[in-house]
Amino acid sequence: MDFFNKFSQGLAESSTPKSSIYYSEEKDLDIKKDEAIEIGLKSQESYYQRQLREQLARDNMMAASRQPIQPLQPTIHITPLQVPTPAPTPKPRQQQTNTSSDMSNLFDWLSADDNTQPSSLLPALTPINAVQDIISKFNKDQKTTTTPSTQPSQTLPTTTCTQQSDGSISCTTPTVTPPQPPIVATVCTPTPTGGTVCTTAQQNPNPGATSQQNLDNMALKDLMSSVEKDMRQLQAETNDLVTNVYDAREYTRRAIDQILQLVKGFERFQK
């Protein structure tokens, strides 16, 4: 019986050495450690991939909402400004050699001021000095009397009478040209958001007229140049923004490639 027990104990020691038991336990610890590292790497990989996918989706949305803007051509609408029609000016009075008709007109005008009949003044104003006084008074009255008008820049015609050497009286009235209506131009430019911005400018042919807009007498050509300059600047800013989005997308793609290469390197290292 003792012999059998010794034989069994020796057989067990020879078939399962202690070193193999220790080796198997150490190998199990290494396997568990490698599995924990692999699980951690996979979780980190999934986290970074999810973050990169979300960032890439946001970049794609920004790039889609900010596409390059085509150059927009401004639309010009020119509408004439309605101005009050000036009062018709009387035709210039033709020179007349009939002294009696001119004298009667002057007597009628003088009688309207003095509330007297022209027939009573006719025999009393026959001397030459009296005629000169009447003409001087008539011309002075024409220069000092003004008619109210809605256009202060418009000059009223003045009738001037003179006595010729032969005793005849001639009256002349200069022709006054009415002012030209100003030119009004409206520039409408579409905006990237879908709206429209309109700017109105007035170009008055009269050099002494003041502008009704807050453009400080800006010419239409200068206004168009300013609008085109602003559009070119807006186009350049938009192109820079789109380029930055494309660069961010390329950087994200390269970062994903680097992470994938790192993961493959860990896998080869584990093998």
From Swiss-Prot:
The entry's keywords: Host membrane, Late protein, Membrane, Virion
Ranges for region Disordered: 80-101, 140-180
Source superkingdom: Viruses
Induction: Expressed in the late phase of the viral replicative cycle.
Modification after translation (UniProt): Its phosphorylation state is regulated by the OPG054 kinase and the OPG106 phosphatase.
Residue stretches of biased makeup (Polar residues): 92-101
Pfam family for this entry, one: Orthopox_A5L
Cellular localisation: Virion; Host endoplasmic reticulum-Golgi intermediate compartment membrane
Biased composition (Low complexity): 144-165
Gene Ontology CC: host cell endoplasmic reticulum-Golgi intermediate compartment membrane; membrane; virion component
Family in the record: Belongs to the orthopoxvirus OPG130 family.
Function: Component of the virion core. Participates in virion assembly.
Subunit structure: Interacts with OPG136 and its cleaved form.
Protein name (record): 39kDa core protein OPG130
Organism encoding this protein: Variola virus (isolate Human/India/Ind3/1967) (VARV)
Encoding gene (name): OPG130
